[in-house]
Every structure is written in C-alpha cells, then in structure tokens.
C-alpha cells in the first residue's frame, strides 16, 4: 500500500485500531492448478492478542510496540480451500477503518476559485505475518471465548434492553449444549497470524486547509457520522493546522 509520510500510522496507532477492530480480509497466495500463484481472500472476525511485553511498553508511553507485535486469531470453515491448500509466503489481513466520500461542495475552497475535486478518505491497516492453521479443538474453543465475549459486550452496549434495565443479555460459548459445541468445533479450524509487520494509513484530509477540514467535519456531523467527525476533529484538524502554520512560516522567510 502506498503511504505518504503525512498519512502514515505508527505501530502503536495500528495496534490501537486492531484492539477495536471487528473483522478484516485474510489474504493468502496459493499455487493454482497450473502452478501459477493465485490469491485467495476471506472476510473474518478477528481477535488481537498482544505480544509479550506490549503492556509494559504501553505503560511507558512509547510510540512503538515493544516485545513483539502480537497476533490475530480467527476461524475458518474447515472446507474452505484457503486453509486446505499450502500458503505461499506470508499472509496479510487488511483491516478497514472508517471511510467516507468527500464532496467539493462541503469545502470552502469550492467557493474560492473551485480548485478542488472529490476524493475518498479512509483508515486502513495491513497486517503482515506468518499464518498457522490450528486443528486442535481445545485451541479453537479457547480462542473463540474471548472473541465472542468482546463482540457480545460491544453488541450489548447498544441494546435498548440494557439501556432500560441496566444489563443487556449476552451470549457465551458455554451457553450452548456441549454436544452442539463439539459438532461446531469439528466444522472449523483456527487461524493465527503471527504479526511481523504493520503498515497503517490514515488518509483523512491532513493535507487540506484547516477551513476545508472544518467543512468536512460539519458535513459528517450533519449526516450523523459522529465517529468520523471526531477523528477529523482530533487528528486531521490539528495536522492541517500544523501544515498551514509551517507553510505560512516558510513563505514569511522568503
């Protein structure tokens, strides 16, 4: 992925996205029938597992992740060809953050000469690593519990029943009958991506004028896209202001 310096995310910022992620695309390469490499892609929910020492690095306030980058854990149908064929080289998980269309009509620059075009803003993290397939039912079950718990808690947080009673109902793997769970476990395999490299990109208008970023924020808020608006207010607007001030300083020195 092409990442200009002003759009690049640090490893710590990438990990922050992984800890909140829902799902992402597992991308692998396999030998086709004629030996030609063929990509394969499956969209999966993932659980981020920090590497050893990551918590200590976070407490120290470091900008990078210490003690290893950790891993992503997920599950695939046992009959999925993606896990039945040998993988060539490393695998990648593509994580999609927020994204949205940017219309010129929302930007003050549109009314100040019209030198503006539409674009698409987005946040993404490409997670590279070595993929391991796990066939042990105990490993698969142990990896399902935290994944299910996290997403159940996230889902329950928006449940009107919880807002009314103070506690929304949630589901746990152990709620299901054991024979049913055993049958389900036989139908899947576990996949673990041991992370070797993170590439993060936030193309979120940091290179625009502060006025244009403010226009985008207003447009997002008007459409109820509050999380995207908050990101641009907290990250993009300060970056745009720093860029504006730097360019103004350089002009003054000429």
Regions found by a protein language model. Give the residues of each.
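C-terminal edge-of-domain segments
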Residues: 132-254
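A short, structural micro-pattern
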Residues: 20, 40, 68, 87-88, ...
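Short, structured beta-strand-loop surface elements
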Residues: 65, 77-143
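Short loop/turn segments at secondary-structure transitions that flank enzyme active sites
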Residues: 32, 50-52, 80, 99-101, ...
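Short beta-strand segments
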Residues: 21-78, 93, 104
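Hydrophobic, proline/glycine-rich low-complexity stretches
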Residues: 1-22
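Beta-strand secondary-structure signal
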Residues: 73, 92, 128, 190-194
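Catalytic micro-motifs at enzyme active sites that drive phosphoryl/nucleotidyl and oxygen chemistry
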Residues: 13, 28-35, 82-83, 113-116, ...
């Amino acid at each position: 992925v092409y990442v200009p310096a002003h759009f690049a995310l640090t490893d710590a910022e990438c990990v922050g996205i992984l800890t909140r992620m829902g799902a992402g695309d597992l991308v692998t390469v396999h030998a086709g029938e004629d030996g030609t490499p063929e990509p394969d892609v499956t969209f999966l929910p993932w659980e981020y597992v920090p590497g050893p020492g990551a918590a200590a690095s976070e407490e120290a306030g470091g900008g990078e992740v210490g003690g290893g980058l950790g891993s992503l854990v997920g599950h695939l149908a046992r009959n999925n060809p993606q896990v039945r064929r040998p993988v060539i080289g490393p695998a990648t998980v593509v994580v999609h953050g927020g994204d949205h269309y940017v219309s010129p009509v929302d930007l003050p620059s549109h009314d100040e000469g019209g030198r503006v075009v539409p674009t698409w803003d987005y946040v993404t993290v490409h997670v590279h690593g070595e993929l391991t397939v796990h066939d042990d039912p105990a490993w698969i079950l142990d990896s399902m519990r935290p994944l299910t718990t996290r997403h159940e808690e996230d889902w329950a947080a928006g449940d009107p029943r919880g807002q009314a009673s103070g506690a929304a109902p949630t589901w746990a793997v152990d709620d299901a009958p054991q024979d049913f769970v055993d049958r389900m476990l036989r139908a899947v395999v576990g996949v673990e991506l041991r992370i070797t490299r993170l590439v993060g990109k936030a193309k979120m208008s940091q290179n625009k004028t502060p006025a244009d970023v403010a226009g985008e924020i207003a447009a997002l808020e008007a459409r109820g896209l509050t999380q995207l608006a908050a990101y641009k207010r907290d990250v993009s607007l300060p970056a745009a202001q720093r860029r504006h001030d730097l360019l103004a300083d350089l002009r003054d020195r000429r």
